[in-house]
Amino acid sequence: MARTEVSGKDRLSDLPCHLLCRILSNLSTKESVRTSVLSPRWSNLWSLVSVLDLDFQDFKGEHDMGEFIDSFMEYHEELGLKLKSFNMFYDANEHLHEPFVRRLNKVVRRGVCDLNIQNMVDVDVALVRMPPSLYSCATLVNLILYCVVFDHPRSKSVSLPSVKKMYFEGVKFDGDSVLETLISHSPVLEELTVIPHPEDYLEVICVRSQSLESFRLESKRFECDNPKVEIDSPSLEFMSICDKKPESLKIHRIGPFAEVTVDVEFDVEDDDPLEISKIRKFLVGLSTFHELTISARTLESIHDYSKVGPLPPFSNLFGLDASLVESSWEVLPAFLSCCMNLDSLVIELDCVPEMEEIKLSPVPQCVLSSLDFLQLKAPSTPSKMKLATYFRKKCTRLTKMLLSGQ
């Protein structure tokens, strides 16, 4: 076969400089630098890209990485270019605080929009401290931080007018009001994820925001140290709370049709009226939701509570996704008995109950008469088919049923 002659000039190199820089911005800085050997046209393009995406493992040490950042930033400053995105995978074991703060201050002043710092070391003494300039970055839109420390700021110096997304994992806050201050001074914040450092000793996590649409909290701390949680975000469309044993969980306001995922655990003790009152308030707040995903350990806590106090009516609940993984069927009916208007039910099981268990703990009549959709996520066994048959015969309004594996 005859070989087709190829032009010495590729079409990609004919593109305007700003388009080539946009293409390079989707690569890591290391990969972007490698393109400099393609041709004279590409030799300097990587240095014009508005993104720095660095991995400490690509350098001999922090000094070399620091010199690279300084050189890149100085060149950008000479040309009057903005740095839109700064991503750093970092080893705080080799960390020098003052040079780090100085460089991060430069990044903030260059009008950064996306800031992502991942410290690979999560021990307390190696956490990276954030500079004060970060609290008043007018251009910042997305803030993603792993294993860092926020010192207590002066409230008047905090202003994050453009931030829409915050993701904090393994983060320590120097004082209960630090996180609340960051949230309250971010007027357009839409998405917030908080996974505190296991050795962070916050007593209160307070989320008050008029603009927030999505909030996820996952606590990995020891149960005796878990904080109080308060939510007041009327625009919230999605909320996920995973906290082993929160001191308290108060939900003042969220969006009327928010999808809520709850994975919490409470101690139910007959001789502790304060604990019983706390659980009651939590359940009353939970009863206002329309769509709810609930974990096995939360169902177990509700089941235990039902033995010592009445459950509130969940008349607003129309959709429920209930997990019984590593749990038993008997914990579910107590909660279902309060769901008089339930329209959609998803049950996740790792062990399908036998009919004898269901007869001892039957599905309440209010659910059998209101249910329109049912999905059973469980291993394929004869018991699963019997459970499906049970629902099909008992449910008077059921129009759709799905059977699936886990």
Curated annotation (Swiss-Prot):
FBD domain ranges (all copies): 355-405
PROSITE patterns: FBOX
SUPFAM superfamilies in alphabetical order: F-box domain, RNI-like
Residue ranges of every copy of the F-box domain listed in the record: 9-59
Family matches, as Pfam families: F-box, FBD, LRR_At5g56370
Record InterPro entries: F-box-like_dom_sf, F-box_AtFBL13-like, F-box_dom, FBD, FBL13/AtMIF1-like, LRR_FXL15/At3g58940/PEG3-like
Disulphide connectivity of cysteines: none
Signal sequence bounds: none
Name of the featured protein: FBD-associated F-box protein At1g60410
Native organism: Arabidopsis thaliana
Lineage: Eukaryota, Viridiplantae, Streptophyta, Embryophyta, Tracheophyta
